[in-house]
Amino acid sequence: VNGTELNSKVAVVTGGASGIGKAICAALAAHQAHVWVLDINSAAAQESAAEINRAGGQASSLPCDVADPESVSQVFNDIASQGSIDILINSAGIAHIGTIATTSVEDFERLFRVNVRGTFLCMQAAIAVMLKQSGGVIINLASMAAVAGIPDRFAYSMSKGAVRAMTLSVAKDCLGKNIRCNCISPARVHTPFVDGYLKQNYPGREAEMLAELAKTQPIGRMARPEEVAGLAVYLCSDLASFLTGADLPFDGGVLNLRG
């Protein structure tokens, strides 16, 4: 993607303080977008934006609880009052390990609240702004768990299946409005969440278990956040102007090459 492809575009990234979201923030800024880093962790969001600015990019940050309608409304109104919202990346999300038998109602509702309700609220707020301007681009982070049976991921799979379905519905409803909506469905990505999970559950065996996780991917390793970010940059650019209503698997062969 040409380095000036996103010049002057305003991008809002939820969950932008860590993992895939943070990598997407950095990649968009490197391609000349002005990035708003949103995260429930205010200090981490500020640091993510500061890193971008120190590297010569343009970034601002705001604390945002994506599951709280008042928080989302206030944040998006604040951003819109300063200009446009050309790009929305819904990367905020939480994970949960468990089968239907071991998932509590509280955990189920917590996953729904953040992953589904949060994506809905942010899309709704961004689209209201995009309809008043020349359009925009929305990218939701779904997962291979939305379309493939993943063990011990019942509530997470439910939530990402909903994200995928919302993506297609929004893309359909926004045809003719110059608003494109797609989702990216990664397989395993080596993020701080993975490291934290291994440290908590396999102390002293982190390297061994990381290698085991890598073996579950047909390509032989987990994805890097920066690789997902590269796809996101392309989807935000005019080079992808023909692409909407797509669920793009970023899976190292998981869907078609396992077994």
Specify the residue positions occupied by each region the protein language model found:
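Short C-terminal tail/terminal secondary-structure segment
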Residues: 2, 148, 233, 244-259
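Canonical Rossmann dinucleotide-binding motif of NAD(H)/NADP(H)-dependent dehydrogenases/reductases
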Residues: 5-36
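Substrate-binding pocket helix/loop in short-chain dehydrogenase/reductase
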Residues: 99-100, 107-112, 213
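Active-site loop-to-helix junction immediately N-terminal to the catalytic Tyr of the SDR YXXXK motif
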Residues: 103, 149-157, 169, 197
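Active-site helix of classical SDR
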Residues: 123, 159
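Alpha-helical segment proximal to the catalytic Tyr-Lys
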Residues: 128, 172-176, 241
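Residue(s) in the substrate-gating loop at a strand-loop-helix junction
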Residues: 143
